[in-house]
Amino acid sequence: MSDDPETAERKMRFLFALRQRGVTDPRVLEAMERIDRGEFVRGHFEDRAYDDTPLPIPCGQTISQPSVVGLMTQALEVGPRDKVLEIGTGSGYQAAVLSLLCRRVYTIDRHRRLVAEAEALFRHLGLPNITALVGDGSRGLPEQAPFDRIMVTAAAEDPPGPLLAQLKIGGIMVVPVGQSDAVQTLIRVRRGENGFDYDELRQVRFVPLVEGLGQT
């Protein structure tokens, strides 16, 4: 079914805003055009699905600002044969975007409700290359390591050691670093033969990366 004129206009403005804020990779823009953010926003916030702003979701979490999703995805430099680990499933929006750019996405969240709802959306949208798991994201997913790319959508005080260890040589991790009650710095980590290189990308604000499992 085609969108009504108002929704179509909002989606067009949404994509224009992404470009204005620095999302220029054609593959990333195409993926974000194909994955409708409106599918991942519910309740009172549905009419803001195409605004460039973070929005609340259940379990005290948020769906990230679209331009930040685009810039993080762009910084990850995902290739079509890559195996990607995402820490922090949340609404499932970021994993859905990544799934159009790579071979396989593993996404972990500490909240069972969020994983169940995201899995239902992935099935509804026909995205079979995403595996969503309930777990402690700070520990990564060692049984599937190493990963070509790792995306962390929650802030850690430092890049988590277990995640660095699960990054393939030649791989890239994008992670927000800093205190949870302050503005954080988004960094890109590249793993080389002799260690890790770090690039600061921009200031961001994310919910904290919490160890253990949630109550819901």
UniProtKB/Swiss-Prot annotation:
Keywords: Cytoplasm, Methyltransferase, S-adenosyl-L-methionine, Transferase. InterPro entries: PCMT, SAM-dependent_MTases_sf. Its main location: cytoplasm. Pfam families: PCMT. GO terms for cellular component: cytoplasm. Catalyzes the methyl esterification of L-isoaspartyl residues in peptides and proteins that result from spontaneous decomposition of normal L-aspartyl and L-asparaginyl residues. It plays a role in the repair and/or degradation of damaged proteins. This is Protein-L-isoaspartate O-methyltransferase. It comes from Paracoccus denitrificans (strain Pd 1222).
